[in-house]
Amino acid sequence: MSQFLESLKDRRSFYSLGHDVKLSEEEITTLIKDAVKNSPTAFNAQSPRAVILFGNAHEKLWNIVEEALKPLTPAEAFPNTQAKIASFRNAYGTVMFFKETDTVKNLQEQFALYADNFPDWAEQSNGIATANTWTALNSAGLGANLQHYNPVIDDAVAEEWNIPANWQLRSQLVFGSKEGEANEKEFLADDERFRVFH
């Protein structure tokens, strides 16, 4: 079994995350940059973008999420929501992944035959970059979980960090030290997902 496949198998969703991180912020930043830069994109569009948050900026993001969800959540359910958000806030950092939409539009104009496909291909590219970053963090000893509070937080995030208008928020990858166990992976039967022909 290749080391790459072992890394894929080892990647899990860790929800109990902390600050006992051995890597420096610079090392983590380099790891994330390398993972995103070396992730393939259709037509070499390189449309994924990443904003890396540590410290106060990381905590600010989850304060924004909590504030955005409060008016949208029934009062009796909000304590559970607060507890969930607190678990993300307690982590070490967050990577926000964005799709750069001008690149997608330009490619649609250049290659009209495939115009309808470019938005889907851009989402695939974002997924690849996100999964590679997640796996790289896990291989470096950090746990992570993936959240999707967009578009509820889009405007507040853009204002707080001066995000360009052509960057569309797609996900939030929360990471930190592994402070608990991950749940067991469950898989559908292979015959539901794969077909092989000769």
Question: Where is each model-derived feature located?
Answer:
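N-terminal amphipathic, basic helical "cap/leader" segment at the start of enzyme domains
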Residues: 1-93, 197-198
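C-terminal helix-cap and adjacent tail motif
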Residues: 3-16, 169-198
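Small-aliphatic-rich amphipathic alpha-helix that forms the alpha element of a beta-alpha
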Residues: 36, 111-159
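Short secondary-structure junction motifs
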Residues: 45-48, 139, 143, 170
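Short, flexible, mixed-charge acidic loops at enzyme active sites
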Residues: 65, 107-112
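C-terminal edge-of-domain segments
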Residues: 90, 95, 175-177
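Short glycine-enriched loops at secondary-structure junctions
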Residues: 98-103
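Short proline/glycine-enriched turn/loop segments at secondary-structure junctions
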Residues: 158-165, 182-186
